[in-house]
């Protein structure tokens, strides 16, 4: 059933709740926890049989500055430094008001989850993700998005939030003053139930699962594998457009250039940041891997067959095995062992004439850090200023990967309080959006994505939206 707007108020016989939240991923769950901490009742409406969403499919890593756990790790950081990193990655095209709001809100939100709700966080050690100037990536000890969702759901339920699963919201009810009066949602038997509310938060993510919208707005990803949650159907944007709400950054998205194929598993970009390289079917490097895994998706898809090989050595393998997603991919047969360059060339399928020379590029590039243009045996040259810490040493390990679309970074335009904006820049009285349903802080292109921006927007946005709703309810809307 298509998302639609219904003018009026749901039947008076329908249950009433102060706050309804569409989506029980990280954004919705954090908002619910924050609302319950303030004593406000809320209901999360989740389309799936249990909370999951894009968060559960992610690595679950959340960037945050100046948290208690980061300080204990001896890392000096600040919201201002984090904001500078965000804008540098986005070439200063990210929405300034959201960069400031999120970089300031995420640390306190993470500390509250740990101190008040017993969600343990660690700071990842040993490497930096592209664009981050210090170690600020937080994770639950399991280092998976699924484990993060489990902890957030536990905390939300313990705080007294209600989570209604198998409830796909298809209707937003609105009065003549554009005030949200309730929602309609489809149950497993195709019946439609209604819920009246005083405020509504859209935490239902983006449009990556909507093939038509992807083809229109993200043509580079038209034929890419979608590795996100299928519930990302663009409902929030459809509702917003029907209400004449503004949208922003709809060409922004997070891709990933290291999706193991055919296993269908995410391979951490930490392997590239620690000295790994990507080679195409001709044995050629074709981009600077340290620029970011999001834009790497486009580079990989542009290679012969739309695939590449992520190549690394034993020292990097040790780091890789600290990530559960990698271990699952390895168990599924994604990791190939190559005793020397000739075996690696045979695996990749390089032309026999060039195989040894091409694979020698692994050593050549790790030895040269001069930033000069280099020619790949007749291919176009490009400037590569990547500085390697050391040379890769045999045996080599290789994983066949493709580029994938993970989630979109554009959506409904919002102010710093996560209130949805109309075309005239005024805010709807009681409609809020955050996380993937709203514009993020990655600007309007794939290269603007700083690692962790998705969960930054979800967690910080969820906390901010909840606090905005708390103030709205105090004012009786």
Model-derived segments and spans:
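Extreme N-terminal leader/targeting segments of oxidoreductases
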Residues: 1-19, 37, 471-474
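C-terminal structured subdomain/cap of oxidoreductase catalytic cores
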Residues: 45, 326-328, 410-477
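An anion/pyrophosphate-binding glycine-rich loop and adjacent beta-alpha core
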Residues: 237-241, 246-356
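Glycine-rich loop(s) and the adjacent beta-strand/alpha-helix scaffold that form part
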Residues: 188-191, 195-260, 455-464
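A glycine-rich dinucleotide-binding beta-alpha-beta segment and adjacent secondary-structure elements
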Residues: 171, 357-441, 445
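Helical element adjacent to the flavin cofactor pocket in flavoenzyme catalytic cores
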Residues: 140-194, 198, 243
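N-terminal Rossmann-like FAD-binding beta1-loop-alpha1 element of flavoenzymes
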Residues: 19-44
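Conserved N-terminal/central alpha/beta ligand/cofactor-binding core
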Residues: 4-11, 47-162, 168, 279, ...
